[in-house]
Amino acid sequence: MSTPLDHIRNFSIVAHIDHGKSTLADRLIQLTGGLDTREMKDQVLDSMDIERERGITIKAQTVRLSYKAKNGEDYVLNLIDTPGHVDFAYEVSRSLAACEGSLLVVDASQGVEAQTLANVYQAIDNNHEIVVVLNKIDLPAAEPERVKQQIEEVIGIDAAQAVHISAKTGIGIEDVLEAIVTQLPAPKEGDRNAPLKAMLVDSWYDSYLGVIVLVRIIDGVLKKGQTIRMMGTGAKYPVERTGVFTPKMVQVDELGPGELGFITASIKEVADTRVGDTITEDRRPTNKMLSGFKPAQPVVFCGLFPVDAADFEDLRAAMGKLRLNDASFSFEMETSAALGFGFRCGFLGLLHLEIIQERLEREFNLDLITTAPSVVYRLNMQDGSQKELHNPADMPDVVKINAIEEPWIRATIMTPDDYLGAIMKLCQERRGLQIDLTYVGPRAMITYDLPLNEVVFDFYDRLKSISKGYASFDYNLSDYREGDLVKMSILVNEEPVDALSMLVHRSAAEKRGRALCEKLKELIPQHMFKIPIQAAIGGRIVARETISALRKDVTAKCYGGDVTRKRKLLEKQKEGKKRMRQFGKVEIPQEAFIQALKMGDD
């Protein structure tokens, strides 16, 4: 049943967002008859509603295509569609490790973008053969020759043989299939008779079948009825089904060397299936594990709280379900005096945060408040120990801290020349250090080192608005560096509000504090007593706004008469207000939290 190795091609498609990866995948499926016309829809592989609406791919998907080449031979092509967005670079790295070749899709009207570079370099690091595909050549603005030259200059791959296609209209799709067969290599030698060795590429949860595991067989044969063992976790399972995606699930009897397929094995927890783990047969194990991947580290943390405290258990259950599908999302319980019970969650980046929040709200009908996103700081304590700080509210006493280190990123920004000045100004405002500036035709490529803390809030939105949407941005974490950071607390009526505390750079503290106090002044309703709103760093107040009191006209009932009568009533009111101020609680509406946290860095 297994296909001979030299007739298998495992490949992935890498490209910048919106350059047409998923549409090309649709055409390849259509042309090879993976789905009939009735089942075809746009972006077949984007299975989540959010993926379709935003037009982005989040989870990597796989398809097995059968193709009869022009030389009369039958080939099996395994395609892995990868996400293009920087937050999901982890999904990309894992998909690339399961393949031997890549199609590099570049939009013929836009040329090379920042994420094109990041993903191509990952493919080259995995020793991939690369076939260049120029998409959207039917557009009037397409300039294939200029883009070819740009690919050669920027990436350094020979683009003379590039395949010209239009994934939307279907021009040139057959040429792509031929190029895959002729230019991409077959899987490296695999031995059918050796002990089973397979790489776990991905896993997700299905409510009927339990956990479905995507595997790439390297040696040996995987079939129904075997007992497999995960070498990393040591867990053992009997295999119930083996199969492939065409993109429908189709069961097969066995998976041989070089093939990509799925297995189900009554696994209840996705946590038991570590991505990059080696799967082997329990009876006859292989002695050497695969090198695997490094697990995804959360980069951005924020608190998620239900607007209605009664939804807490529902939120816990919903997060557990999302965790089954997304191993890079982590959470733990936390309580806040202002917001009640909730969770501290870790994400790969801001888009990841937004998507998880949106999925919780849509798929589970929850109303949520998110606190300001923060990054992981390292605290070097006076006693020589090192701590990680995920939540600014938990910061220990400043006296005990020797130094605070913050994560920095290496960012690559590609932009048309016209917006270069404004973008450099933005990077400098965010404490960026310029590393490099090169020109590729009319576009500039700038490399900056930036503190992640400054990027987390709204850097991406600002970049897009400054450049009218033309600039593209990609980053990877570089290292931790010492920074002059201080904890800013917000006091409302002289009570600290833990959900609004944040770590900021000393130079920006006053500006941020003032802006936040002004915002809260607009959002908190007036009470019967005066409310001060203060931003404090340690014991020093750096900004203050006051919400004036509402007052009842107590003297309205006095018609004329002695002035002492009026004075007595006013004094009595003053006493009451004083007492009220001492014991009164200021109610901060939920809306105020949401707005204040959205403020970011305006």
UniProtKB/Swiss-Prot annotation:
Catalysed reactions, semicolon-separated: GTP + H2O = GDP + phosphate + H(+)
Keyword Secreted: no
Keyword list, A-Z: Cell inner membrane, Cell membrane, GTP-binding, Hydrolase, Membrane, Nucleotide-binding, Protein biosynthesis
Major subcellular site: membrane
Molecular function GO terms recorded: GTP binding; GTPase activity; guanosine tetraphosphate binding; ribosome binding; translation elongation factor activity
Class of the enzyme per the UniProt entry, highest EC level: hydrolase
Membrane topology: Peripheral membrane protein
Protein EC: 3.6.5.n1
Subcellular location: Cell inner membrane
InterPro entries per UniProt: EF-4 (IPR006297), EFG_III/V (IPR035647), EFG_V-like (IPR000640), EFTu-like_2 (IPR004161), G_TR_CS (IPR031157), LepA_C_sf (IPR038363), LepA_CTD (IPR013842), LepA_IV (IPR035654)
Hydrolase in keyword set: yes
Stored PANTHER family: TRANSLATION FACTOR GUF1 HOMOLOG, CHLOROPLASTIC, TRANSLATION FACTOR GUF1-RELATED
Name of the protein this chain belongs to: Elongation factor 4
